[in-house]
Swiss-Prot record:
Listed InterPro entries: ARM-like (IPR011989), ARM-type_fold (IPR016024), PP2A_B56 (IPR002554)
Stated name of the protein: Serine/threonine-protein phosphatase 2A regulatory subunit psrA
Organism the protein comes from: Dictyostelium discoideum (Social amoeba)
Cellular component aspect of the GO annotation: cytosol; protein phosphatase type 2A complex
Keyword Cytoplasm listed: yes
Amino acid sequence: MKNDHINYQQNLSQSPILNSNKNQTQQNQQQQQQQQQQNPQQQQQFQHQQVPQLSPQQIPFSEPLKNNLTLQHQQQQQQHQQLAGGQHGSLLRKSYSSRFHEKPQGELTKIANFQDVSPEERPSLFLLKLKQCCYVYDFSDNTYMVSKGVKQEALLQCVNFLSTNDQPLHESIYKMVFEMVAVNLFRPLPPRINPYGVMYDPEEDEPILEAAWPHIQVVYEVLLRFIDSPTFNTHIAKNYVDDRFVLQMLDLFDSEDPRERDYLKTTLHRIYGKFLGLRGFIRTAIRNLFCTFVYESHQHNGISEILEVLGSIINGFLVPLKDEHKQFLIKVLIPLHKPKSYSVYCSHLGYCMSQFIEKEPSLAEPIFKSILRLWPCGNSQKEVLFLSEMEDLLGLVSDEQFAKFRNQFFRQMTKCFQSEHFQVAERALYLFSNENIVLLIASKNNFTLALETFYKPLHENSISHWNRSIRNLSISSLKLFMEIDMDLFNKISEKYKESKKKQQQIQQREKFKQNAPETQKSKQINQNNNNNNNNINNNNNNNNNNNGSTETKADKPSMIRRKSLLPVDPSTIAALSSHRSLEDIMSTNSNSGNDDDDENNHTNHDSEIENEVKEDFRVPVNNRYTFT
């Protein structure tokens, strides 16, 4: 091997293509140095390209100048957006697809084609073309158009070389291939929130396509052709395809461009198949990515593609399954039912669930119980997707496994039957059109419980549901149960009628009890009033017997009546008894001189009345008195 390596290096050094290209590169470097000396502003221009641009809103200008700058900034963004792939996505959301660190260099020169050289010189020419492909350009502007064309042509020629080459390649070419792939592919993706604050929604917004896709696509093709080539040596490639390479590739799955995610899916599957030592690390990295998505970020663009790769990986698991794989199912895959973006990857997640049930049927119980526990109560669209997944998985479950979670399943189905959202109820009732599900329900062990659980909601739906199609489906479901076992159906219907009558009787009793306390209260009030009246009459009789002397003076109207338990004030009684009208007072004043003798008679008469009233009201304090 050492001798071959030395001979290979000697051949490369003696190659006329390499020598000519070296001379060309030296000349280009000298020209660049002269240009930089003559134009010192050119170097500043390259340095300026690496500085991140600020929006006009972030720079303190005067208002008129600031408005002008904002208009120019928006026009530049629109131009970049059109160059990046047309009218894809919202202009307010993002302006650039990805961020490359462009290398300042001159224009690339075209190298000879593979057809123009001998087969022995093609590996060295392939190495030169790979070096040319390591230059990265910004596709948001129209600069370096010649170099972009030269690079794209070199990439296409590399693809053709790898598809036709049947000779083993040297380790230096392995290093150069993966270096070129890393330079072109591994880049920071744009943030989800731009300065305008609008977030990308994968379900509603159109994705912004990658501006540099003409080059990136061919780079992916080079990598795939290189890994799939019959002369590919994993022992050499494992020095360059390591854990860091895998992590950087998994980070690219968050790209908005679906074309890139499709290539990443294929590439990751090839790496998993070729590099046996990386399989455990790839599964661990996928587990960490899923856990971050479920419990932290809740946003990722490539979950569906990763699950598709994972489905093929699970398909290759050996039976019986390892505890590691079972824990991966319970702690990583099943929690993927929680996020709101479940509709994006539900089909691939359901396929992974079905693969685990096929590999080990005993996993059906934890899978179904977990899905029923994570059932979305407030999201009708997600409920419909859950019902579809349940239908697919029930086709793989045996009668013995179904008996372990049938109670939870039947309870959830009754809730879905009675749902006010007609799509949920309709999708749940369509389960009875699946032969596998009907066979599970119609078995001897499950039919009695199923009919007892389903009869009431189906009967109520057939009568009172607001949607006509739901009423018709409920009636057809009842007919299906009737055809399976007529006798049992009649028994359960009679039980339902009896329970309905009992409920009506209970409701009537409750209404009667609610009205009964009101009548009892009215009776008690009447009795209390009667008792009070009797007590008042008795007290009056006692007072009349004890005060017989006052009854002789019935000529004078009584001025008082019972009112409260307070004692009687003699001064009040005297004031009331001595009350006279205004005419009497006026007449007394006018006749005061003539009636001096009568004044003594009046005072004596008033004192006699006061003494009589005091004697009449010498009663206990507990008696009630009022004044009229």
